[in-house]
């Protein structure tokens, strides 16, 4: 019996795919460093709302890459045989996998890893085209099948996009090569099977769920666990929240309060839990009020800055979800970078039938270990350890 138990534990551990994430300077920070942010903001209106609920044709998805402006967490995957490595965003707010290819002549591709099908013995071409639109242009490419190495296992026969054009020279400064989407297949452009679905269908993960831990302090230590939960990353028990709409990881918020007073979402509202969005975003009017309450003001770079000395005096902002309170302290919702501090809130307006929509991005996820349960269509949350 003891040996059977040990064997079962070994089998489960082999079906838990652990993908380390590293924290790097964001695209925004790289643009500031290179004196390019003002030019970027002039030519690319940063609109986080355009990522969600796009109007799309059958072969067109709308996934604005400007919305990854502040993303800081990235993982490495390999594609092909032998594997060609790529740095990607593990994004619960989209569903496609795509990387640059050697067919791409855009400046944006020139400083990134590019997939070469000729160097892979397992690549299978298709005649399908992919176009992911955003801003003033679109990422165009083709779809193909190959083996994807993720967390030490081989995801065979995985469909993915190979970019041929990537508009906007700003992507030259992006700290990532491509995107690995972890949302539901219903929002996948071209009907492409997402990576996690393919892993589950092949029996490569032991549970139909995955979880995310984002470290607040270290460049390393963050992780995506495909197929399992690691209780060492959180304290107490997981609280489960039903997914309200299966597409994005969308849930219902009860309210948002400060000092016991409701400041937003007074009658309940919808929220998307999105690892591919760095900040906490909500309706522009509600966010404007919050920025005023915490003393944030816009600087010449379009950032909402705040005095770092305010961190010790400001109150928590509390998100109540499914009857459970999830407080964010000022040190969580105010972002410190050297001697400067910026607000972790950003305004957006998304026209949805469900009304007010919020995005719980990395500012929230850093404080709460998050489980994305596909089997039961639930999101699990617990304070990080």
Curated annotation (Swiss-Prot):
The keyword Metal-binding does not apply. It catalyses: Preferential cleavage: hydrophobic, preferably aromatic, residues in P1 and P1' positions. Cleaves 1-Phe-|-Val-2, 4-Gln-|-His-5, 13-Glu-|-Ala-14, 14-Ala-|-Leu-15, 15-Leu-|-Tyr-16, 16-Tyr-|-Leu-17, 23-Gly-|-Phe-24, 24-Phe-|-Phe-25 and 25-Phe-|-Tyr-26 bonds in the B chain of insulin. One of its GO terms (cellular component) is extracellular region. Minor amounts of the active enzyme occur with 'Ala-58' at the amino end. Residues 16-59 form a propeptide. Coiled coil: none annotated. Belongs to the peptidase A1 family. This is Pepsin A.
